[in-house]
Amino acid sequence: MSFESTPVSLVKCATYDEDLVYQKVKEAVDLLGGMKNFVAPGQKVLLKPNLLSGRPPEKCVTTHPLVVKAVALLVREAGATVLIGDSPQIESAKKAAHKCGIGKVADDLGIDIVEFEPVTVPNPDGKMFKNFTIGKILTEVDRVINIPKLKTHGLTTLTLAVKNCSRNAQGRVASKDLPRRGRPFCQDAFGPLYLY
């Protein structure tokens, strides 16, 4: 599948009612062929929500915990093992997750929250970087499911799912580089992060 023909599904969800969120996330995934189209039984799958910082869901900074829960349940129903992780800007992933409600989801479902321990990986064809320091867990899982929070950003206007992958690079390093280098940097730098 090429990037030019990647399908997208959009489903409206009027409230953060737990049953409704699950139903709508499942509907969106089913429009793309179902979770079994993305993960296979026995695979290890990292859910990558936006855990920028430990803010409660009503502050709209991080991915809503009920969305993470719905995706986790769908991945499990497809027979895969689920992990949750990110590289928050200031605190550990576990601390941020518990502050924003994702930690409770992980506890309730028996899912491990993993920290992004740094490892350097090559990127020989990169325009901006010839290597990246990313979370080691990204090299150890079979799949990564990006679960961003829809919001705006000063360097990319509307980030959609792209900016959430910048957290795959070590959080504090990524946050220092972005404002200093500007929009062209963001556009050329984010693409190669999807390779890992």
Features from the language model and the residues they span:
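N-terminal and secondary-structure boundary signal
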Residues: M1-Y196
